[in-house]
């Protein structure tokens, strides 16, 4: 049985398209290197994903007694969450909808083989 730990952040206020840009950079990296890469990224998604990766690492450490140095990011998924619909007033009494998109970020870390 492989050792895996999972962490999920639901309804994060960032569009899935923007979050996937950062998630693609981290997928498959060793856990320590992934956290380091996210720490120095300027993107908003990097901060959110870093928290989820750190949570998954802590879950592996505390729940399964895993060694942090052996962990790697096995799976990272960014799924679409519920969309908040807002209204913006426009000229001549019209209005347009603003879609404030949210994401569900799932990270699975496991022992590197």
Curated annotation (Swiss-Prot):
Entry's Gene Ontology BP terms: translation
The keyword Transmembrane appears for this protein: no
Top-level taxon in the UniProt lineage: Bacteria
InterPro entries: Ribosomal_uL22, Ribosomal_uL22_bac/chlpt-type, Ribosomal_uL22_bac/org-type, Ribosomal_uL22_CS, Ribosomal_uL22_sf
Keywords: Ribonucleoprotein, Ribosomal protein, RNA-binding, rRNA-binding
Any one GO cellular component localisation term in the record: cytosolic large ribosomal subunit
Keyword Ribosomal protein listed: yes
Gene3D superfamilies noted in UniProt: Ribosomal protein L22/L17
Free-text function comment from the UniProt entry: This protein binds specifically to 23S rRNA; its binding is stimulated by other ribosomal proteins, e.g. L4, L17, and L20. It is important during the early stages of 50S assembly. It makes multiple contacts with different domains of the 23S rRNA in the assembled 50S subunit and ribosome.
Self-association state and partner proteins as the record states: Part of the 50S ribosomal subunit.
Official protein name in the record: Large ribosomal subunit protein uL22
Organism name: Stenotrophomonas maltophilia (strain K279a)
Gene behind the chain: rplV
């Amino acid at each position: 049985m492989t050792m895996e730990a999972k962490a999920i952040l639901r309804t994060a206020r960032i569009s899935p398209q923007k979050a996937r840009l950062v998630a693609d950079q981290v997928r498959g990296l060793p856990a320590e290197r992934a956290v380091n890469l996210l720490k120095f990224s300027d993107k908003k998604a990097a901060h959110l994903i870093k928290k989820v990766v750190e949570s998954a690492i802590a879950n592996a450490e505390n729940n399964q007694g895993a060694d942090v140095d052996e962990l790697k990011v096995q799976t990272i998924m960014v799924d679409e969450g519920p969309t908040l619909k807002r209204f913006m007033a426009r000229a001549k009494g019209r209005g347009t909808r603003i879609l404030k998109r949210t994401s569900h970020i799932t990270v699975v870390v496991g022992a590197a083989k």
